[in-house]
From Swiss-Prot:
Gene: mtnA
Site positions per UniProt: Transition state stabilizer: 153
GO biological process, one term: L-methionine salvage from methylthioadenosine
Pfam families: IF-2B
Catalysis performed (reactions): 5-(methylsulfanyl)-alpha-D-ribose 1-phosphate = 5-(methylsulfanyl)-D-ribulose 1-phosphate
Listed EC numbers: 5.3.1.23
Name of this protein: Methylthioribose-1-phosphate isomerase
Binding site for substrate: 44-46, 87, 192, 243-244
Family matches, as InterPro entries: IF-2B-related, IF-M1Pi, IF_2B-like_C, Initiation_fac_2B_a/b/d, M1Pi_N, NagB/RpiA_transferase-like
Signal peptide: none
Amino-acid biosynthesis in keyword set: yes
Pathway(s) annotated for this protein in UniProt: Amino-acid biosynthesis; L-methionine biosynthesis via salvage pathway; L-methionine from S-methyl-5-thio-alpha-D-ribose 1-phosphate: step 1/6
Classification of source organism: Bacteria, Bacillati, Chloroflexota, Dehalococcoidia, Dehalococcoidales
Similarity comment: Belongs to the eIF-2B alpha/beta/delta subunits family. MtnA subfamily.
List of catalytic residues: 233 (proton donor)
Amino acid sequence: MKAIEWRNNRLIILDQTLLPLEEKYLELNDYHAVAEAIKTLRIRGAPSIGVAAAYGIALGALSIETRYCSEFLPLYQQISAEIASTRPTAKNLFMAVERMDHVVASGTDVLQVKISLVDEALKIHREEEEASRKISTFGADLIQPGWTVLTHCNAGPLATAGYGTALGVIIAAHQQNKGISAFATETRPLLQGARLTALELKEAGVPFKLITDSMAGHFMKKGVINAVVVGADRIARNGDTANKIGTYSLAVLALAHGIPFYVAAPSSTFDKSIESGNDIVIEERKPEEITYLRGQRIAPENIDVANPAFDVTPANLIAAFITENGIIRRGE
């Protein structure tokens, strides 16, 4: 399965909302469709969102029918703003938008700017692929033979437009014949762990167990989990980390049981512009994601629902960050 591909000036994505029941690829021909795909999680995972955002902007720019910079620029700004507004938490999205904006700001010829935007999007994609490969290699060195590693949500190839970050670490350790196994949390409310991580672990041949989110503490107490590895959507300058809701709970549980808690993420996820997790905007998603399951209501009508998509794990709970540049341990 390939999450995202640029082909003949069209963006091809795998609709992740349908997995694992249906493998369906969508051809996105305009930036509005890309924006909608990001909002509705057809493409998801911070690195993949960044790549999709870059391609979406390139698609939009290619559709602008003018050769005059004075006419091109305001139309481009509308495109960039719409893509940037899709999801507020993932740093990779804003990194991609900033890089594409810089290409436009540096250009003087509309045709050349369009070519350069496509080139920049392809470059961002290549960089994310290479980063996840290196993260997987560095992270595998932390995993000891025979360990069982717990992961949360989905940070594999589907989420990263490459090899995977947290899940890439687990898969790489397995491929090194370390005899490891995994626990995957189902990840309510949208079940990315059950639908996507379980699928990727199965395809990679990694022995694993799927568990509900609330079972993690039980298995930590039993002593069968040796490490936790998760991905990230945004990391503040002090190391506070935003990731899928439930990550903070796992970090607290890991600390209570003396289990190392690792965050695997590319440098594009680190946000040096914010001091701490208090500055990270947490996306609030629609209540129907909790009150409905596969189109069927599972909760009473007319009730209040809170549905934050992410939480923030304080840096002091994180043993180390696994990046494409190596391991950054707590306090470094």
